[in-house]
Every structure is written in structure tokens, then in C-alpha cells.
Amino acid sequence: MERGEQVAAKTDNLDTRLTIAAHHEAGHIVIAAAMGLRLRPEGIMVDKGAWGLACFYKEPDESDESKESIIVATFAGYLAQKRFCEERGYSCPLPDDLEVTLSPDSKEARGIETNLSKQYLGTRTVPEVHELLQQRAAELVLQHWPAIEAVAREVASTSLAPLKPLKSGTQWSDQTSARSLPGDEVVKIVERFGIKAVCVTES
């Protein structure tokens, strides 16, 4: 699965929305790399309508550690978007707004949370774990903010090019062009910030 659609930014300025989208997707992919998840060759794409995609391997194995990593990386997109908007004074949906709680990212994370083992949960409820993992994601976004900003800047500075199809064949955008940063380029950027990342092609 390669999906990282951001929560809609509350601005009519397209350039601003593109930059916000770049930070959302950078949040996903940088924290995915920091959590040891493998990146996909497609990397990051933000279409000309300011909707984006972060491509990393989201299929968890049976371990709770794998599920936790994917949940945290999934939360990180909105949290990076929120941090960027707050820094720049842009309006951003609040965590409890329906467009956040019902977003594709939130639904995806909650779906994985229901598959966490009883051993992992212990005496905690799923909602309690949800809050803890959101907090963990927020801490990682803060810790790796320089890397997130560097990746986002690189995405936002690229020129629009014809939209490339995903290797999976999934159509993620109805636009014809997008800004993109391949996975191997993401690896080079985050390594400058001490993150050991891996980009692999699915066999």
C-alpha cells in the first residue's frame, strides 16, 4: 500500500497548499525511515492540485513492532503538517476535527491498531495505545524536524512533470502532473541528518 493523503489545508493559495502537502508527505516518509521502514522507489509525489503521496512499505508483518512503526509513520504526516502550519501562521484542522479523525491516514492507523496483540496491549485499551503512539509520533516529528523540512523543501522546489504511474498500478491522483522526489533521493537527504534509510524495489 502506498498512500499518504494529507488532511486538506485551509487555504486557497495553491503554492501554500503545495508546500503544506510537501511537509505532510515528508513527515510520513522521514518518520517511516527513522522507524526502520523501507522506502519505495516512487518516494514522494505532490500533484498540481496539492494532494500528495508518500511511498513506503506499509504491509506489516505479524510483529507488533512492525505494526507500531507503521502506525507512528502514518500519524506523522498530519503532525508534520500541523507543526509547519503553526510555525507559519496558516490555518490547520485540529486533531479532533472530523476531517482529521476520519481522514484516510487516521482510518488506516486505527485499522492496524485493532490487530495489535493482547500481549502488546497488556492492561491498556486500544484508545490509550492510540494516544501513546500519537505522542510518540509527535516526539519523532520534533526530533527529526530538520530532516522533514529538508525533504519538504526539495519536493516543493522541483518542477511539475508528467505524473508517473505507481509500480502497483494504483491510480492515486486524477491530475496529469506532479512534483516528485524519488525514494533514493529521500535516502540521501535523510542520511545527512543521521537517519539510515533503505529504498528497495519490490521483487
Where are these regions (language model features)?
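Soluble catalytic regions of large protease machineries
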Residues: E2-S203
